[in-house]
Amino acid sequence: MFKLLLVLALTMLAQSALAGGGSKSTDTVIRFG
């Protein structure tokens, strides 16, 4: 179950990075980290 959440988080991270949301992806890393 936790692995699924981790995969979802990484997918969202990759999407925001592709969208050019550098600061957004950093906020996500801090939030999940």
UniProtKB/Swiss-Prot annotation:
Its main location: secreted. Negative results: has no effect on human neuropeptide FF receptor 1 (NPFFR1), NPFFR2 and kisspeptin receptor 1 (KISS1R). Has mild effect on ASIC1a channels (8% inhibition at 10 uM) and no effect on ASIC1b channels. Expressed by the venom secretory cell of the spine. The spine is a cuticular structure containing a single large nucleated venom-secreting cell at its base. It is an independent unit capable of producing, storing and injecting venom. On the back of A.stimulea caterpillars, spines are grouped together by 50 to 100 to form scoli, of which there are eight. The modification Phenylalanine amide is found at F32. It is found in: Secreted. It comes from the Eukaryota. Keywords: Amidation, Secreted, Signal, Toxin. This is U-limacoditoxin(13)-As11. One of its GO terms (molecular function) is toxin activity. GO terms for cellular component: extracellular region. Is toxic when injected into Drosophila melanogaster. Also shows a low anthelmintic activity against the parasitic nematode H.contortus (drug susceptible Kirby isolate). Residues 1-19 form the signal peptide. Belongs to the FARP (FMRFamide related peptide) family.
